[in-house]
Amino acid sequence: MMLSAVLRRTTPAPRLFLGLIKSPSLQSRGGAYGRGVVTGDRGEPQRLRAAAWVRPGASSTFVPGRGAATWGRRGERTEIPYLTAASSERGPSPEETLPGQDSWNGVPNKTGLGMWALAMALVVQCYSKNPSNKDAALMEAARANNVQEVRRLLSEGADVNARHKLGWTALMVASISHNESVVQVLLAAGADPNLGDEFSSVYKTANEQGVHSLEVLVTREDDFNNRLNHRASFKGCTALHYAVLADDYSIVKELLDRGANPLQRNEMGHTPLDYAREGEVMKLLKTSETKYMEKQRKREAEERRRFPLEQRLKEHIIGQESAIATVGAAIRRKENGWYDEEHPLVFLFLGSSGIGKTELAKQTAKYMHKDAKKGFIRLDMSEFQERHEVAKFIGSPPGYIGHEEGGQLTKKLKQCPNAVVLFDEVDKAHPDVLTIMLQLFDEGRLTDGKGKTIDCKDAIFIMTSNVASDEIAQHALQLRQEALEMSRNRIAENLGDVQMSDKITISKNFKENVIRPILKAHFRRDEFLGRINEIVYFLPFCHSELIQLVNKELNFWAKRAKQRHNITLLWDREVADVLVDGYNVHYGARSIKHEVERRVVNQLAAAYEQDLLPGGCTLRITVEDSDKHLLKSPELPSPQAEKRPPTLRLEIIDKDSKTRKLDIQAPLHPEKVCYTI
């Protein structure tokens, strides 16, 4: 009785169920079920087809359509066939093969188990067809074009942007199903037209969720659409992508009018226009793309005026105002069209380690490409110190191992020609690599090992180097000391001069007479230095900036203590002054990080190990004079005039606001030594 009830629930499912039971064998993968997507070396879809389960007597001929895949510039569009299929109501015959299923021939014992496993998966799928909540019911109503039911469910609190368990939304279902009325209702209720589908392909989704591929296949066809290729990846596709695949002009226009982004790309990197057929839909998308780009430019220009780049960078980088101003000015020229379009922007960041060179490059890429991973390319030039390693840079020549793989730089620049490229520690690279960079910086193009030319005139190249870092640090410290003495002499006249020591500038005389000869001696060529637009100098941190670094590091550990151990961490103002003493001009912010770990985090770990920190407690870091709390060993003479640095101690704050010091035991040692906690 249950089986008959299940068979009445859907139309294609019972025939598929009976076909599985009757089938004596199933052929190997890829039989008559249709072709999958063939992906080219650029990731473009070569074919989108799906098999159709047609009703008895109906024609099974595929209805060819035409789509387009962009293989580079828009003017080089190549027409490719994609899918549409006749209606699907008949399951595969016993001779047909289900996609993605292996052959069962020759294994009689496992055949029965395999067929019954698939059959039971289908039974479970069919029996669970009935929506069990409002969100699932909304999906069903959206596909059935039941406008009244959609309105009722939305009024009762159904989430208009809720996702199916496999990743799509009700708006995507209505768009692929040609249900314009439902699309209008959903958009009016606040549906987001720019949400991307989380469903990839049948087999990948089945593997990710740990279910059988047949269950995913039937669910996709019953709950979404039965005319899409099961092997194609739809991850990241928006409702506009699906409306274009359905070639529905009215729904495409409705989505665009409601704010759908025609430039949004799916996981494969394709916009809706890449799937459009020749006709009204393609014309509408081209017009919308042009208008959207113009609005986007105006919106970004207004945003830049209200929130300048320098201000954004200062939120993530402490100090280095001169470096931020130099980079911000160059980026502003580029964004507003006041730059040489035939040459890329090239920077050389000079300074000691750990003062923000790499972080500034990362934040620049984040600003330019909105967190896109492809927009930031980082190459550690210490990996290219030998001559034979140059091949890894642009790819091996024909006949050599790795020729088909391409180079580390050229391969990534193909994917994003306007990326921000960081050459970290460029002073360690082999001279032959610098020769390649000459062409890259001068002409904005690069030829890979396959002989193909990559045009990257719109890219931004940033090199970092520790060359002349000692000279820059010593000169900056000298300038800061002179400015500090000057401000002390003028403190009675103008209190604003106290901060003069924090703002210093490297003189032109120092750059020309000290730095440039060092760079020329190292890189050994003027033409290489002449192709650099800006040489940016990173200076050592001043005292106020070091205090910010300490507080930033303490805030990091306070957040970690709260998340992992439910412990609230506080500290006195004097703690930052004590930790600043651990700063080393040669190691930059890393020395502060290590000092906090040695003097604070070590105590936290020891106290936690000794069960001195109850859950939900509040800790405070305080400063004590170490001379009063020195643990003396009888074998060692007591210190007389020796001055010890202040000691940081942990105190626990009770519920009645009383504090008590934690007695953290020093680790035992075979020899009797003196410990200072």
From Swiss-Prot:
Its main location: mitochondrion. GO terms for molecular function: ATP binding; ATP hydrolysis activity; ATP-dependent protein disaggregase activity. Widely expressed, with highest levels in testis. Also expressed in heart, skeletal muscle and kidney. GO terms for biological process: granulocyte differentiation. Residues 92-126 are annotated as: Autoinhibitory. ANK repeats lie at residues 133-162, 166-195, 235-265, 268-297. The record marks C126, Y127 as: Cleavage. Proteolytically cleaved by protease PARL. ATP-dependent protein disaggregase activity is stimulated by PARL-mediated cleavage of the N-terminal autoinhibitory peptide. Its EC number is 3.6.1.-. The keyword Hydrolase applies. ATP binds at H316, I318, S353, G354, I355, G356, K357, T358, E425, N466, R531, R590. It is an enzyme of class 3 (hydrolase). Residues 1-50 form a transit peptide. Keywords: Acetylation, ANK repeat, ATP-binding, Hydrolase, Mitochondrion, Nucleotide-binding, Repeat, Transit peptide. Functions as a regulatory ATPase and participates in secretion/protein trafficking process. Has ATP-dependent protein disaggregase activity and is required to maintain the solubility of key mitochondrial proteins. Involved in mitochondrial-mediated antiviral innate immunity, activates RIG-I-mediated signal transduction and production of IFNB1 and pro-inflammatory cytokine IL6. Plays a role in granulocyte differentiation. Homododecamer when substrate-bound; the homododecamer consists of 2 homohexamers stacked head-to-head via ANK repeat-mediated interactions. The active substrate-bound form is likely to exist in a dynamic equilibrium between homohexamers and homododecamers. Homotetradecamer in the unbound state which is remodeled upon substrate binding into the homododecamer. Interacts with PHB and PHB2. Interacts with MAVS; the interaction is enhanced by Sendai virus infection. Belongs to the ClpA/ClpB family. The ankyrin-repeat region is necessary for ATP-dependent protein disaggregase activity. It plays an important role in stabilizing the substrate-bound homododecamer by mediating contacts between the two homohexamers. This is Mitochondrial disaggregase. The gene is Clpb.
